[in-house]
Amino acid sequence: LLGTSTPMPVADPLLTAARGNHHDAIDMANTWSHSSFGLMGGNEIPGMCMTMGGQRLLERSKDDVFFTDLNACNEFINGAELAQKITVATLVVFANQDKMTAAVNAMEVAETIPNCRTVRLQPCGHSMLSEQPNAVLDALKTIV
C-alpha cells in the first residue's frame, strides 16, 4: 500500500473544485502531493520538473475522473476493519512529508494489518513515485 490512510478524507475545497473540473483542484493536489524537496525541483534528471509532470498528468484526465477518484477516497469507510482481515504479507510505504495522507495515518493502517512491514521515504511527499521512484521500487522488491 502506497500513501494510504483510513479514513481518507478529502478537503472540501479540493473535492468541490474537482467536482466542477476546475484547474484549482489540480493546483491544490499537485502542491499538497509534493514535499518541500519536490516543490523545489529535486528531480535526479536535469530539466525535469516533478510538479509540472504531475500537473500535465492530471490535466490529461477526462472530466470527472479526478473527482471520482477523490470522492471514492472521501467516502471509503470500514478501512480499519477491512485491514484486520488481510491475511497475506503486506507492505505499507509512506512518506515523511505526505500532506494528502499523513505518515501517522499510514502507520496506523499498518498497525491494524497482521504481518505488515513499513517503509518510510524521506524527503518525500504523496507523489512518491515521482519523488523517490528507486526507493519505492526497492521497497516493493522486498514483498514480491
Sequence positions of predicted segments:
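Active-site loop/turn elements of alpha/beta-hydrolase fold enzymes
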Residues: 4, 73, 123
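Conserved alpha/beta-hydrolase catalytic His-Asp/Glu region
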Residues: 7-10, 16-85
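Short, conserved loop/helix-junction motifs that constitute active-site signature segments
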Residues: 83-87, 111-113
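Short beta-strand/loop motif that positions the catalytic acidic residue
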Residues: 86, 92-94, 98
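Active-site phosphate/pyrophosphate- and oxyanion-stabilizing loops and adjacent acidic/basic residues
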Residues: 107-108, 134
